């Protein structure tokens, strides 16, 4: 079991920070290259003529996250838990819009492509509540944790195997003391001994460059989740409590008056949340035997630096370029004429010898520099997956086959990055769904879409499902293309395709009732990025029409049978003779 004494836990935190900082050694350099020399007082000596980081982010982020995600929820127990799955689905889709989780995901997308991203999911009081109602509603919320403040077990071989995760936070000391008066779990005596601004150098806040602020009397502390520790007073996993949260801060008097290196500023408390913990980590590429992923930008930064070095060298050569004209020093008038006459002016010189006027060029870019820059740029584009077609720079020199091959290779890489990001988003929404499913303090209206689907005038989501329902029985899937950007032309084309599909399918539905048209339309809607395609067909109206047609057919058959049975023997013989006469008997 992990030693969770304050001093040992703080030493674990320091070790985790050192390991994290080794992966973020060039983080600030990448940011400086991304924003350029005109942003925020960045040193002009760090200027990158080939701003690959900006280009990669501007081309990739809109393809990864552009809109709020939508989810579909199914269950392994469709008979008994089908209604629960439908309620969680409407609750999650309403929650993504109400909290605008897209804004958090966009910031985390930049972190993911530069280094790695982290989201903290926790329960918070709902905004806009009536204090006189007597009921305090909660719902989950997501927060971006900067890579500079996140910590994870440095000896873990992967994120699920880590024995602890956590993050640094900064708050006003006065606010903590006020909260300690209300909440006895805070250790007021320890908070009073904390020195303000101690540890701020590791908080991710970089002073200077116009960010020098006066003393704010802030303190630095850490929240650490240890999943393997269960407190005696914890209700246990059966009631939604998994692991323990420790809040620790450095001891100012360590080594002088107190042998403890740190102390708990809050009593350890059971963690109420999903068994996967409060943190969700985003990354692009897996690196064996380390919890930190590899970002596509960090993987190519060596080639970016090399390309920029050669471009700077070529730029310096171009700046040193000179074009001189050498003349015979004996002819003063010739030298003056060459110097003073304007461009393209004809200067008549009697008895001019061509050897007396010699043009001379010094410096400038060489062919070798141009060739190597082009080779380095092509290598960077090849490894990063960026090509001219993505940039919109199609000159026509490449064939359609070459453009198609380049687009296919880039699509494979981008599709993998999108898949990794979407899987991390699904994990975040799974944590949100856990709170919606288990916490009875979650109450909020679902809106018009849910009202139409559920057939209720004003449906509300109410958390804390039936005890027989288990969240592990639910399966969450992101709707295809729900987070991606689509162009106006693509939307128009999809609308026309949807119209044609509905027109063809609607006419075939009554004739082939044995086909699962709803499932077929759902699959076609996923391919067209129109997840609600099946809702365009009113299945209840279709059933009514089919039943009406069947009833009409049965009524006609019954009327014909009644007419036959009502005929007298003479009428029956007369009808038979009439039929026989028609066929010539």
What are these regions (language model features)?
Residues 85-89, 102, 106, 173, ...:
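Alpha-helix initiation and N-capping motif
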Residues 63, 84, 278-279, 351-353, ...:
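Short, flexible segments with low predicted structural confidence
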Residues 72-80, 280, 335, 382-386:
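Short low-complexity stretches enriched in small and charged residues
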């Amino acid at each position: 079991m992990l030693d969770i004494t304050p001093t040992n836990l703080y030493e674990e935190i320091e070790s985790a920070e050192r390991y994290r900082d080794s992966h973020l050694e060039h983080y600030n350099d990448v940011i400086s290259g991304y924003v350029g020399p005109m942003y925020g007082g960045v040193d002009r000596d760090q200027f990158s003529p080939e701003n690959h980081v900006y280009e990669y982010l501007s081309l990739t982020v809109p393809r990864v996250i552009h809109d709020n995600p939508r989810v579909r929820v199914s269950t392994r127990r469709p008979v008994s838990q089908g209604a629960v799955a439908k309620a969680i689905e409407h609750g999650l889709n309403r929650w993504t819009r109400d909290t605008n989780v897209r804004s958090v995901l966009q910031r985390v997308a930049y972190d993911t492509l530069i280094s790695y991203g982290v989201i903290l999911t926790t329960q918070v009081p709902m905004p806009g509540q009536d204090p006189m109602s007597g009921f305090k509603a909660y719902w989950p919320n997501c927060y971006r944790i900067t890579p500079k403040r996140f910590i994870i077990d440095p000896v873990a071989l992967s994120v699920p195997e880590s024995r602890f995760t956590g993050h640094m936070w900064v708050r006003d000391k006065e606010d903590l003391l006020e909260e300690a008066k209300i909440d006895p779990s805070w250790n007021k005596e320890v908070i009073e001994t904390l020195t303000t601004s101690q540890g701020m150098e590791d908080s991710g806040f970089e002073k200077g460059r116009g960010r020098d602020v006066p003393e704010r009397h802030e303190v630095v502390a850490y929240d650490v989740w240890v999943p393997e520790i269960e407190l005696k007073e914890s209700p246990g996993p059966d009631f939604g409590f998994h692991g323990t949260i420790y809040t620790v801060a450095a001891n100012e008097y360590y080594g002088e008056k107190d042998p403890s290196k740190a102390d708990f500023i809050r009593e350890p408390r059971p963690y109420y949340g999903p068994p996967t913990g409060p943190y969700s980590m985003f990354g692009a590429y897996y690196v064996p035997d380390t919890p930190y992923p590899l970002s596509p930008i960090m993987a190519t930064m060596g080639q970016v630096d090399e390309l920029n070095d050669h471009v700077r060298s070529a730029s310096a050569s171009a700046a040193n370029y000179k074009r001189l004209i050498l003349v015979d020093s004996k002819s003063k008038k010739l030298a003056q004429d060459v110097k003073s006459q304007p461009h393209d002016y004809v200067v008549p010189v009697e008895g001019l010898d061509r050897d007396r006027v010699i043009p001379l060029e010094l410096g400038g870019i060489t062919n070798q520099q141009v060739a190597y820059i082009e080779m380095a740029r092509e290598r960077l584009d090849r490894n990063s997956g960026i090509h001219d077609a993505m940039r919109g720079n199609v000159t026509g020199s490449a064939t359609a086959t070459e453009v198609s091959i380049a687009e296919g290779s880039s699509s494979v890489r981008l599709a993998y990055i999108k898949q990794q990001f979407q899987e991390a988003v699904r994990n975040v929404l799974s944590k949100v769904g856990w709170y919606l499913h288990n916490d009875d303090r979650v109450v909020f209206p679902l809106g018009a879409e849910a009202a139409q689907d559920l057939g209720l005038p004003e449906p509300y989501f109410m958390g804390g499902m039936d005890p027989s329902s288990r969240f592990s029985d639910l399966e969450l899937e992101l709707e295809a293309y729900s987070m991606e950007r689509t162009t106006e032309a693509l939307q128009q084309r999809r609308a026309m395709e949807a119209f044609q599909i509905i027109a063809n399918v609607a006419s075939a539905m009554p004739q082939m009732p044995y086909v699962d048209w709803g499932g077929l339309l759902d699959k076609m809607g996923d391919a067209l990025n129109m997840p609600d395609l099946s809702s365009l067909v009113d299945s209840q109206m279709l059933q009514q029409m089919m039943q009406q047609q069947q009833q009409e057919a049965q009524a006609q058959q019954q009327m014909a049978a009644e007419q036959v049975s009502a005929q007298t023997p003479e009428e029956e013989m007369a009808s038979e003779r009439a039929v026989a006469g028609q066929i010539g008997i």
